[in-house]
């Protein structure tokens, strides 16, 4: 009788333990968001190469699968990243499948691009981007600029905004180097992207970027500074919506 009671007691404890394990499992966060969920098309060839000149810049490029190119998009990168980031995320391939030509470059000293004294000055950084665009025959482009690359993109925007079809800053640096009046003079269509959990650069850059007269803004929830890594699907949706509606 005692043994029968003990076996029932042990079975009850085992059942309770299994229930607790199940509840704990159900409460755990799900797997990371898939980075290629939006890209279901055929394989896309990612071309690579080096620009000409003294400061040779490594780049990755995809051409539109469709014959007609809807627009050209150039991707810069942040301090901890390089052009490969945009291939790993599937961003380049996705844009190719949607009819865009997309180019991602390694800034000097990152990835496969050698360091260059030229980019130690603002004028040198602008000249570098101008030369890259010319060498790759990029015209009327959309420039995507996260974080550190703001020190390249912002000076270029201020001097050559008439050459850009669109601008996508993602919590960029260098915004404090310009006055509100300078931002108001830029008419380029702009998509301001930032992560909800980025309480440093995003907040600082927004104070200035919001003065761009032709801008829209998207906050990616539960994402930090590198919001495109934390929420790639939401990032791709916002980017494509912006690109698809450019004049």
From Swiss-Prot:
SUPFAM superfamilies in the record: alpha/beta-Hydrolases
Primary localization: cytoplasm
A single GO molecular function term of this UniProt record: hydrolase activity
Uppermost EC category: hydrolase
Transmembrane stretches, start-end: 11-31
Pfam families (UniProt xref): Abhydrolase_6
GO cellular component: cytoplasm; membrane
Active-site annotation: 147, 198, 225
Tissue specificity as recorded in UniProt: Widely expressed. Higher expression is detected in brain, kidney, heart, testis, ovary and uterus.
Enzyme Commission number(s): 3.-.-.-
Localization per record: Cytoplasm; Membrane
Sugar attachment sites: 43
Keywords for the protein's UniProt record, in alphabetical order: Cytoplasm, Glycoprotein, Hydrolase, Membrane, Signal-anchor, Transmembrane, Transmembrane helix
Topology relative to the membrane: Single-pass type II membrane protein
Role summary: Possible role in granule neuron development.
Family annotation (PANTHER family): PROTEIN ABHD14A, PROTEIN ABHD14B-LIKE
Family: Belongs to the AB hydrolase superfamily. ABHD14 family.
UniProt protein name: Protein ABHD14A
Organism: Mus musculus (Mouse)
Gene expressing this chain: Abhd14a
């Amino acid at each position: 009788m005692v043994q029968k009671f003990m076996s029932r007691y042990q079975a009850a404890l085992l059942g309770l333990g299994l229930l607790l394990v199940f509840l704990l499992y159900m409460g755990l966060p799900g797997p990371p968001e898939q980075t290629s969920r939006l890209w279901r098309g055929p394989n896309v060839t990612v071309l690579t190469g080096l620009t000409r000149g003294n400061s040779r810049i490594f780049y990755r490029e995809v051409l539109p699968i469709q014959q007609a190119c809807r627009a050209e998009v150039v991707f810069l990168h942040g301090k901890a990243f390089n052009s490969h980031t945009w291939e790993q995320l599937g961003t380049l391939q996705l844009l190719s499948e949607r009819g865009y030509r997309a180019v991602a470059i390694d800034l000097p000293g990152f990835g496969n691009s050698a360091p260059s004294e030229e980019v130690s000055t603002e004028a040198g950084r602008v000249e570098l981007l101008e030369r890259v665009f010319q060498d790759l025959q990029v015209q009327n482009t959309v420039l995507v600029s996260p974080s550190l690359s703001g020190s390249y993109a912002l000076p270029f925007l201020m001097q050559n905004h008439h050459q850009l079809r669109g601008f996508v800053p993602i919590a960029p640096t260098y915004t404090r180097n310009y006055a509100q009046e300078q931002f108001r003079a830029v008419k380029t269509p702009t998509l301001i992207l930032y992560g909800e959990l980025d309480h440093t650069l995003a907040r600082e850059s927004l104070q200035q970027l919001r003065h761009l007269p032709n801008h829209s803004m998207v906050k990616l929830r539960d994402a930090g500074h590198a919001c495109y890594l934390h929420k790639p699907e939401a990032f791709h949706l916002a980017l494509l919506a912006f690109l698809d509606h450019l004049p």
